[in-house]
Amino acid sequence: MVNATVARNIAGICGNVISLFLFLSPIPTFITIYKKKKVEEYKADPYLATVLNCALWVFYGLPMVQPDSLLVITINGTGLAIELVYLAIFFFFSPTSRKVKVGLWLIGEMVFVGIVATCTLLLFHTHNQRSSFVGIFCVIFVSLMYIAPLTIMSKVIKTKSVKYMPFSLSLANFLNGVVWVIYALIKFDLFILIGNGLGTVSGAVQLILYACYYKTTPKDDEDEEDEENLSKVNSQLQLSGNSGQAKRVSA
C-alpha cells in the first residue's frame, strides 16, 4: 500500500508539472497581442472554457465537497489566476464588441458555477454525493473540450501539414493523459480514467498524424494562426491534468 501511494504521488507530481506547462504555453500568443496592441483574429473561447473548468475544480476541492483537497484548490486556483490574466490582456486590447462578449461569458460562467454550488450544498449531504455530483460536471466539460482538437486534426489531414499542430503540445497531451491514466489505475478512479483516457487517445492520434505528415509539411516560418490553434488545443489539455490532481489529494 505504501508503494502504491508513493507511485500515485509520483504520477500526480509529474501530472502537475505537465499541467503547469500547459497553463503557461499560451504566453507567446499574448506576447504577440501585447506587442501589436490588438487581438486581431485570436479568440478568447479556450481561455473562457478553462476558467469555467478551473472554477469547478476549485469548488470540488473545498472541504465541504471533498475534504483534504488543498492541492486541488492550489493547482486549479493557480490555473484560474493565469487564465484570468490572459483574459484581462485579451479584454484590454479587444474592440468594444468583443469586450462585451467576454464580459457576458464570464458573468454567465459565474452564475453557472453558483448554481452548481448551490445545488451541491442544498441537495446533497455527504461528501461522496457532493464530490460525485461536481465531479460529473467536471468530467463532462473535460470530455466536451476534447472535441476541439478534432478540427485541427482534420486540417492536418486536409493540408497534409502539421504546422497547425505543434509537436510539443501533442506530446504533452499524450504524456499528460498517460500519467493520469496510470494514476487512476493504481487505485481505480472512474472520473480520472474517463477524462484522461480521452486525453491519451487524443494525444496518440495527434502523434500518429504528426509522424504521417511531418515530411509533407512546408518548411516555412510559423504564423500567428499556429499560436491560436495551439492555445485552443492547450485549453483542454491542462484540464485533464487538473482532474487527476483533484483525485490525488483525496485518496
Swiss-Prot record:
The keyword Repeat applies. Keywords: Cell membrane, Glycoprotein, Membrane, Repeat, Sugar transport, Transmembrane, Transmembrane helix, Transport. Induction: Induced by the pathogenic bacteria P.syringae pv. tomato, and slightly induced by the powdery mildew fungus G.cichoracearum and the fungal pathogen B.cinerea. Its main location: membrane. The chain crosses the membrane at residues 13-33, 46-66, 73-93, 104-124, 133-153, 164-186, 191-213. Residues 231-245 have a biased composition (Polar residues). Glycans are attached at N3. It is a multi-pass membrane protein. GO terms for biological process: protein homooligomerization. Residues 12-96, 133-216 form the MtN3/slv domain. Residues 34-45, 94-103, 154-163, 214-251 are cytoplasmic. It comes from the Eukaryota. Mediates both low-affinity uptake and efflux of sugar across the plasma membrane. Belongs to the SWEET sugar transporter family. Forms homooligomers and heterooligomers with SWEET8 and SWEET17. This is Bidirectional sugar transporter SWEET4. It comes from Arabidopsis thaliana (Mouse-ear cress).
